[in-house]
């Protein structure tokens, strides 16, 4: 029963994507494998954070998404799926080419997960001028975009996307997705566009 429940849960979330979209996203890989586990742990010695809700990695030409089952697995699924989708987006759209220009003047990503864990990014998280979902979004551009996507896909985030800087980032991300996956002319409002 647990296995079936988890598979049903996964299928419900994957059904939020238009037909053919995920297939196009994984066309750059031999396969995509999604694994549900009890927990994901890391260490400073390995250059990773101590705990994670999800990870995405490559093994040869196979893409993997590993999710820690629990309350945060929905956001983790969308976050890690975005990482898989981004390969297709960057190769089929120019919308994200100027991403850095959407950040505050003088801002630089950490380009290091461990350094990011020590960052105080509160100046960029003020409600009226919010430029990032959270401090983790300031680690790498890819994490910034994945964090925006995961929150755009889930309920209850209206106030998060009320700030103009984050709204511009969401618009740019949605434009890139539409361009890359041939959805520019679709009249449908997709789940990730619910806060536009």
Question: What do the predicted segments below correspond to?
Answer:
Residues 31-196:
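Active-site-flanking segments in enzyme catalytic domains
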Residues 1-31:
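Zn2+-dependent metallopeptidase catalytic core
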């Amino acid at each position: 029963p647990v296995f079936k429940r988890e598979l049903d849960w996964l299928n419900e979330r994957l059904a939020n994507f238009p037909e053919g979209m995920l297939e196009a996203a994984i066309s750059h890989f031999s396969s995509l494998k999604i694994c549900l586990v009890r927990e994901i742990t890391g260490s400073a010695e390995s250059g990773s954070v101590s705990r994670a809700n999800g990870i995405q990695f490559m093994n040869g030409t196979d893409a993997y998404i590993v999710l820690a089952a629990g309350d945060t697995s929905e956001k983790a699924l969308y976050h890690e799926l975005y990482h898989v989708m981004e390969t297709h987006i960057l190769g089929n759209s120019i919308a994200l080419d100027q991403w850095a220009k959407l950040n505050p003047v003088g801002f630089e990503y950490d380009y290091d997960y461990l350094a990011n864990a020590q960052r105080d990014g509160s100046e960029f998280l003020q409600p009226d001028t919010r430029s990032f979902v959270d401090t983790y979004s300031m680690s790498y551009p890819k994490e910034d975009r994945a964090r925006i996507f995961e929150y755009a896909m889930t309920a209850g985030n209206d106030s998060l996307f009320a700030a103009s800087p984050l709204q511009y980032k969401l618009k740019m991300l949605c434009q890139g997705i539409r361009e890359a996956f041939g959805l520019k002319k679709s009249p449908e409002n997709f789940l990730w566009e619910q806060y536009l």
